Amino acid sequence: MTSIPVSSFLLAALVLQYATSDAVNYCRLPCRGDNYHVGCGEPAYAQECGQSPRTRELLKEHRNEILSKINDVRDHVAKGSWGLPVAARMKVVVWDAELAGLAKRHTKGCVGETHACRNTERFWLPGQLNFKYSGDKLPRIKELIDDAVKKGHLQKHNITREIIGNYRENGPNGDVKELALAISDRVTAVGCGLTTWQDGAKARALLTCNFSSQNTRGRPVYKIGNSPGEKCIEKDETYKNLCPATEPIDPNKSN
């Protein structure tokens, strides 16, 4: 008797979770100041895109590669590696189609940092990372992903225990923004987009990843514990130091 409404509820929840940017009128979402929403209007290429711009499809293998790299780092940090404190409740990150759709639209501007807002009805203040490539020849998508991850991974030399407890974008030895965002315990989802183009003799690419949350200056990157995942309802089977993807963490709630 109760199976029908329960099934209907689950279906509605799945539709909401995996909604794409095409299903929402982003022109109606509020943006700070005079900024425009990246999802508002037609997603045309900008003049900065040079010749032959092309937005690339991130296949399942690419999405899995991104998730694997991010969750590996989160699992590593959560257990107290690199001299960082143990994370009490950091969860496995999942792919989100809506964040990916907005990231894809962002890459069509062919400029890394912009003032366009990217908030959604579910994610009020998403974080964003941009990786720009320039070279004689365009590498494979997997190689672009690996290069982007390596850039963030190198920031382990810059991030400190003090930054985990009191976030700022720069440590004593340099930038920590990419790594700090990847290990935020309020991040629950990520979605990425990729556009490539030709600029004279140079091949260029912009890989953008939107995260469900962003770090706030002066606030903790994650909550510290005595043992990894001590505040999780249960532990993930693959990433032993993380909560599973089902852990009910609110990405809009500040630490």
Curated annotation (Swiss-Prot):
Q: Which domain of life is it from?
A: Eukaryota
Q: Binding of leukotriene E4: at which residues? A: W82, H153, K156
The reply to whether Disulfide bond figures as a keyword in the UniProt entry is: yes
List the GO cellular component terms: extracellular region
Q: Where is it made, tissue-wise?
A: Expressed in salivary glands.
- Cell location: Secreted
Where on this chain is Cell attachment site (motif)? 32-34
**Signal sequence residues:** 1-23
Q: Name one Pfam family in it.
A: CAP
- UniProt GO MF annotations: toxin activity
Alphabetized, the UniProt keywords read:
Disulfide bond, Hemostasis impairing toxin, Platelet aggregation inhibiting toxin, Secreted, Signal, Toxin
Which CDD domains would you find in this protein's record? CAP_euk
Q: What S-S linkages are listed for this chain? A: C27-C40, C31-C117, C49-C110, C192-C209, C232-C243
Sum up the protein's function in the record's words: Anti-inflammatory scavenger of eicosanoids and antithrombotic protein that inhibits platelets aggregation induced by collagen, ADP and convulxin (GPVI agonist). Exhibits high affinity binding for glycoprotein IIb-IIIa receptor (ITGA2B/ITGB3) and endothelial cell alphaVbeta3 (ITGAV/ITGB3) integrins, but not for alpha-5/beta-1 or alpha-2/beta-1. Accordingly, it blocks endothelial cell adhesion to vitronectin (IC(50)~1 nM) and marginally to fibronectin (IC(50)~1 uM), but not to collagen.
The name this protein goes by in its record: Tablysin 15
